[in-house]
């Protein structure tokens, strides 16, 4: 997992290496790309001496990836940096590098803001949000996962301007409002590193950096600078048309109908009326079309609305509830999709912008 931090194009050659630090029967392994630094701590069964050294990531990974799980003995000569790794049936010999030039990270000060989040909550919220982040070089502020801590709740938000995810957790709050914007790379790293039985995660942050401590390691990262847009202002609050439908059934219908939509627009049409939910698509250029009906619970006047099919499928795929509620105001305003049953102490909301229908 540490190897995923290391960039293929590092500005400093030493960052192609892992930093090994041995002290007090503990070995700390560090990987960095200058913006993100991950440290993992390993308890040693036996240790003689202390010190630090660097090993190129390709050397150590190629050496160890073919070995089955077993104890290893690592012997390093301080003067020459000669390394010998002894395993059950053999050994490796190679040369390490001095750790003198490896960049060091500074711990956050006590003045930094902090949040304590259960690992399972953080994993679920980041996993639900990452698909909605942007890849926009002109608006880098939209490329991250935004954490907004208020006296009422912690909101974890992501948006690319076409779709939006807002996760509210009411058990995590702060009298002093604070926020930070976590870049996509460290967010992905956290999603893959953390385990759901990993206890609580402590996040300390200031205007520029964050330090995230979990059960057996720490991630330091640079934050995205800038003011995040007012995400609440784009969420319609008056949505008289509401459809409750089986999430998996709707996903399956979209998979069948979407191939018949225009390849360029991927427009699918949803029509709701008197307990009838119709999903359809059409490609006028190739004279193809598809239509499928689902059962639903619907309140409101008959309505047709268009969405980009692939985006709607992404939204539905990142929810886990059996049923979802689609809330609409009119065909020109954003649609809101929420789980029919919200997770405990949470309010999960996804928003998707509509597309113009050719009536």
Where are these regions (language model features)?
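Structural preference for solvent-exposed beta-strand-turn elements
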Residues: 1-359
């Amino acid at each position: 997992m540490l190897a995923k931090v290391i960039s293929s194009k590092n500005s400093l050659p030493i960052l192609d290496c892992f930093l090994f630090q041995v002290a007090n029967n503990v070995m700390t392994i560090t990987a960095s790309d200058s913006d993100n630094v991950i440290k993992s701590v390993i308890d040693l069964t036996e240790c003689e001496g202390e010190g630090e050294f660097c090993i190129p990531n390709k050397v150590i990974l190629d050496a160890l990836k073919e070995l089955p799980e077993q104890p290893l003995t690592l012997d390093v000569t301080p003067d020459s940096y000669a390394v010998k790794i002894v395993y059950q049936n053999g050994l490796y010999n190679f040369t390490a590098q001095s750790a003198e030039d490896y960049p060091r990270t500074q711990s956050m000060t006590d003045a930094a803001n902090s949040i304590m989040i259960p690992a399972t909550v953080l994993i679920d919220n980041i996993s639900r949000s990452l698909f909605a982040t942007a890849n926009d070089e002109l608006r880098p502020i939209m490329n991250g996962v935004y954490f907004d801590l208020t006296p009422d709740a912690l909101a974890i938000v992501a948006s690319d301007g076409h779709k939006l995810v807002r996760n509210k957790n009411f058990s995590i709050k702060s009298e002093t409002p604070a926020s930070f914007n976590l870049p996509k790379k460290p967010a992905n790293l956290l999603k893959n590193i953390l385990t759901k039985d990993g206890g609580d995660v402590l996040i300390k942050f200031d205007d520029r950096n964050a330090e995230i401590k979990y059960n057996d390691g720490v991630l330091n990262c640079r934050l995205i600078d800038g003011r995040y847009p007012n995400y609440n202002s784009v969420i319609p609050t008056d949505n008289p048309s509401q459809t409750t439908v089986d999430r998996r059934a709707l996903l399956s219908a979209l998979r069948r109908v979407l191939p018949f939509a225009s390849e360029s627009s991927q427009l699918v049409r949803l029509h709701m009326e008197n307990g009838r939910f119709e999903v359809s698509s059409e490609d006028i250029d190739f004279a193809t079309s598809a239509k499928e009906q689902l059962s639903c619970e619907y309140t409101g006047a008959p309505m047709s609305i268009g969405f980009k099919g692939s985006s709607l499928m992404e939204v539905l795929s990142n929810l886990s509830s059996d049923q979802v509620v689609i809330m609409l105001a009119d065909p020109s305003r954003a649609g809101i999709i929420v789980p029919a049953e919200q997770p405990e102490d949470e309010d999960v909301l996804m928003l998707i912008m509509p597309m113009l229908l050719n009536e």
